[in-house]
Amino acid sequence: MIPLSHGLILAAILFVLGLTGMIIRRNLLFMLLGLEIMINASALAFVVAGSYWGHADGQVMYILAVTLAAAEASIGLALLLQLHRRRRTLDIDSVSEMHG
């Protein structure tokens, strides 16, 4: 069995990696990937903590996180497709520009 500290450190590293990917990259697709990594890191923390304390709550929260990630991915990809069709780019800065 993996110690609690090792699992939580791995989850924290993955979360920081996803957060860094969201902050640094300006491409909407890479921002969605960073968000998915962050959601999976938090789900990993729930599973590790649930395994450590011997409760099934961690697995239940993992199923909830996977459901949330699927909904987020479908909405995010729909927005990504609309942005690409209208602007011919995936750069997030092009959305914030004002056109008049």
Swiss-Prot record:
Primary location recorded for the protein, binned into one broad class: membrane
Subcellular localization(s) per the UniProt record: Cell inner membrane
Catalytic activity: a quinone + NADH + 5 H(+)(in) = a quinol + NAD(+) + 4 H(+)(out)
Keyword Cell inner membrane in record: yes
Disulfide bonds: none
Membrane topology, from the record: Multi-pass membrane protein
Transmembrane portions of the chain: 4-24, 28-48, 60-80
Entry-linked HAMAP family: NDH1_NuoK
Name of protein: NADH-quinone oxidoreductase subunit K
Species: Sodalis glossinidius (strain morsitans)
Gene: nuoK
